[in-house]
């Protein structure tokens, strides 16, 4: 509670144009899961997760409210970003929305905020998922070994990064997790497959199974 209060206060104190807040929220979870398969695998994994979200409000000259937010998340509370800086960054992002307006459609250079990376990777992930490939519902069907992006882009699926939120020792089928280069300098190198999708495509699993889905 105190951590959330300090974060919210930092946002409100940052600039007089921050007129209010929709609150600051701290969420924390600790849990574990066991996996036993008919193939003889038995495994157990546990972990924790903590996040902080701050949502300040500002106001246009015409009275229109603008809402912004910033967040931080880590495996462990002791490693969470400083709550005061999270609050201040939330205020900065909120103030950037002042004067925002619609523009006509056009082709132009775009600078992505770092947070946009998560959304972009989510879209890429759905397109390289084995289920999407064998069902032929992805535009990346039959694109292995071809350029699918700028040569400046390299994407790595690495569930072995120490303390990373998505890290795991084994996948949903009990196969040992591994690091895969998905896109290297713009070239599509692999799809992400569980055993079923791998069999459908005649390819080995990349240990990418998640419980309750095929990919």
What would you call each of these model-derived segments?
Residues 1-50:
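Hydrophobic alpha-helical hairpins/lids featuring a short glycine-rich hinge
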Residues 7, 143-215:
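Dual-mode signal for accessory low-complexity, basic/Gly-rich regions
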């Amino acid at each position: 509670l105190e951590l959330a209060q300090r974060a919210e206060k930092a946002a409100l104190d940052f600039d007089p144009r921050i007129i209010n807040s929709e609150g600051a929220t701290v969420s924390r979870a600790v849990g574990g899961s066991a996996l036993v398969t008919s193939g003889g695998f038995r495994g157990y994994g546990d972990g924790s997760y903590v996040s902080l979200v701050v949502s300040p409000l500002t106001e246009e000259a015409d009275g229109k409210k603008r809402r912004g937010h910033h967040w931080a998340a880590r495996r462990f509370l002791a490693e969470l970003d400083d709550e005061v800086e999270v609050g201040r960054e939330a205020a900065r992002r909120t103030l950037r929305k002042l004067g925002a307006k619609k523009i006509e459609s056009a082709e132009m250079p775009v600078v992505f905020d770092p947070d946009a990376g998560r959304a972009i990777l989510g879209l890429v992930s759905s397109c390289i998922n084995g289920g999407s490939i064998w069902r032929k519902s992805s535009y990346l069907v039959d694109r292995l070994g071809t350029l699918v992006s700028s040569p400046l882009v390299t994407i790595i699926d690495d569930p072995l990064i120490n303390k990373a939120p998505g890290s795991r020792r084994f996948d949903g089928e009990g196969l040992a997790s591994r690091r895969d280069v998905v896109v290297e300098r713009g070239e599509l190198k692999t799809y992400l497959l569980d055993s079923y999708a791998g069999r459908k495509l005649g390819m080995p699993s990349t240990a990418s199974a998640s419980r309750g889905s095929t990919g």
